[in-house]
């Protein structure tokens, strides 16, 4: 174990490329993420999102279980807001603001901004976007496709 002590430790200021390579190596050793998940994690890292691999794995698992990405995002946003409230005093009126818009996360600390970026990426890639669907029109307001009952163009003389 003395050989691992050589070089910069986790507390020192290592270049971002070295830190990313170190995280990648640790992930491969732990086998936390599958190959596809690793590719998605690397894309998130390349986009500037600094997120713990274990947290990323939890997010991916939630999305695989068809949990709505918006629900995951709002939960994480409220958790991050709770951490900020505990660490720094804020105006109580700021806590009651609605948490529905994604761009609010851009000015926050690195961790929550990274989570917001990953979740925004996941929201865009989710094909089921149930929160963005328009409600169906009731069938009573639709016109019948044929001219009327029994007047189908496919009916002919027999």
Swiss-Prot record:
Extent of Polar residues compositional bias: 128-140
Single GO cellular component term: spindle
Keywords per UniProt: Cytoplasm, Cytoskeleton, Phosphoprotein
Localization: Cytoplasm, Cytoskeleton, Microtubule organizing center, Centrosome; Cytoplasm, Cytoskeleton, Spindle
Keyword Cytoplasm recorded: yes
Modified residues (Phosphoserine): 34, 152
Keyword Nuclease recorded: no
Segments for region (Disordered): 84-158
InterPro entries: MOZART2 (IPR024332)
Start-end of Low complexity biased regions: 112-122
Pfam families tied to this protein: MOZART2
Family as reported in the entry's similarity comment: Belongs to the MOZART2 family.
Subunit organization: Associates with the gamma-tubulin ring complex (gTuRC) consisting of TUBGCP2, TUBGCP3, TUBGCP4, TUBGCP5 and TUBGCP6 and gamma-tubulin TUBG1 or TUBG2; within the complex, interacts with TUBGCP2; the interaction plays a role in gTuRC activation.
Record's function text: Required for the recruitment and the assembly of the gamma-tubulin ring complex (gTuRC) at the centrosome. The gTuRC regulates the minus-end nucleation of alpha-beta tubulin heterodimers that grow into microtubule protafilaments, a critical step in centrosome duplication and spindle formation.
Name of this protein: Mitotic-spindle organizing protein 2A
Species of provenance: Homo sapiens (Human)
Protein's gene: MZT2A
């Amino acid at each position: 174990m003395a050989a691992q002590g050589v070089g910069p430790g986790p507390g020192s200021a290592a270049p971002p490329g070295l830190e990313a390579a170190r995280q990648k190596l640790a992930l491969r050793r732990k086998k936390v993420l599958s190959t596809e998940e690793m590719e998605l994690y690397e894309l998130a890292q390349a986009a500037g999102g600094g997120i713990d691999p274990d947290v990323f794995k939890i997010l991916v698992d939630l999305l695989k279980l068809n949990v709505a990405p918006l629900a995951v995002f709002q939960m994480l946003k409220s958790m991050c807001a709770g951490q900020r409230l505990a660490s720094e005093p804020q105006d109580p009126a700021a806590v009651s603001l609605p948490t529905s818009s994604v761009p609010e996360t851009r000015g926050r600390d690195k961790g929550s901004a990274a989570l917001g970026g990953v979740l925004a990426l996941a929201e865009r890639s989710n094909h089921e976007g149930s929160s963005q669907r328009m409600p169906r029109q009731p069938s009573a307001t639709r016109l019948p496709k044929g001219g009327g009952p029994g007047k189908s163009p496919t009916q002919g003389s027999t």
